[in-house]
Amino acid sequence: MRVIQSICEMRHYRAGIANDKTIGFVATMGALHQGHLSLMKASLAENDYTIVSIFVNPTQFGANEDFGAYPRTLEADIALCERVGVSAIFAPSIDDMYEDDEVGFSAPKKMGYILEGFDRPTHFAGVLQIVLKLFCLIKPHRAYFGQKDAQQVLILQKMVRDLFLDIHIVPCPIQRDSDGLALSSRNIYLSASERQKALCIPRTIELVKKRILQGEREVATLREIALQSLQSEDITLFYAQFCNHKLEPITHIVENKSIFLIAAKVGQTRLLDNLWI
């Protein structure tokens, strides 16, 4: 396994891969967990090469967010990737990836400033900026992203379509801890009592899923069930919303190819979860 830390070396490595070989890519900010490993394993199963990036991207953090505190565990991450069997890690510096007076990026006007983008208006512009840079360097055939970040997945799929990129965005199922909480690098911020409170989020997802499987499709009814479940704990709810794959709100009947998205703060930690229908 190669550990690559410069753009020059990344370009050299990529140029050495034969044209008839496929490349899978997993973009991460490090602090790797089993959710990331599931993305790597999906890539390893479908591609000749799997490249993982580890880069805590400053442009997707807001002014009062946790960029400085975000966990950085590069040595452990490298060991984990080596055990899984990925081909290469790309772990550049901020100075390598960004120059002064960068070309500006913006998120899609409809998709990028609702839900997560409402509370974090610069977030998706930063995500698109770094992912496009990484795509340009690595030139993958497939890129693997977790469905936990549903809005991110849909916006990246739109970017690929809009820019005519020959890259397939592969959404991968949410991975959960034994207690049901969706895996996230930020879960380490939770105290034991906060984690117990946070479990109302996956319980709500399961409750909504169960009612849909039983035949309930009225949005108002399902949302009321969800809100009652979420209000059982002392958490700050940002949204509990049914949307289609264009992130347009569904207000009457839940149909196939819908998503139920939840974002809530437990203590000081923002948590996401969702149900793909």
UniProtKB/Swiss-Prot annotation:
A biological process from GO: pantothenate biosynthetic process
UniProt keyword annotations, A-Z: ATP-binding, Cytoplasm, Ligase, Nucleotide-binding, Pantothenate biosynthesis
Compartment(s): Cytoplasm
First-tier enzyme category under EC: ligase
Gene3D superfamilies from the UniProt entry: HUPs, Pantoate-beta-alanine ligase, C-terminal domain
Highest taxon listed in the record's lineage: Bacteria
Chemical reaction(s) catalysed: (R)-pantoate + beta-alanine + ATP = (R)-pantothenate + AMP + diphosphate + H(+)
Enzyme Commission number: 6.3.2.1
Active site: 36 (proton donor)
Pfam families: Pantoate_ligase
InterPro entries reported for this sequence: Pantoate_ligase, Pantoate_ligase_C, Rossmann-like_a/b/a_fold
Binding residues for ATP: 29-36, 146-149, 183-186
Entry GO terms, CC: cytosol
Other comment: The reaction proceeds by a bi uni uni bi ping pong mechanism.
Biological role: Catalyzes the condensation of pantoate with beta-alanine in an ATP-dependent reaction via a pantoyl-adenylate intermediate.
Entry's family note: Belongs to the pantothenate synthetase family.
Subunit note: Homodimer.
Protein name according to UniProt: Pantothenate synthetase
Organism name: Helicobacter hepaticus (strain ATCC 51449 / 3B1)
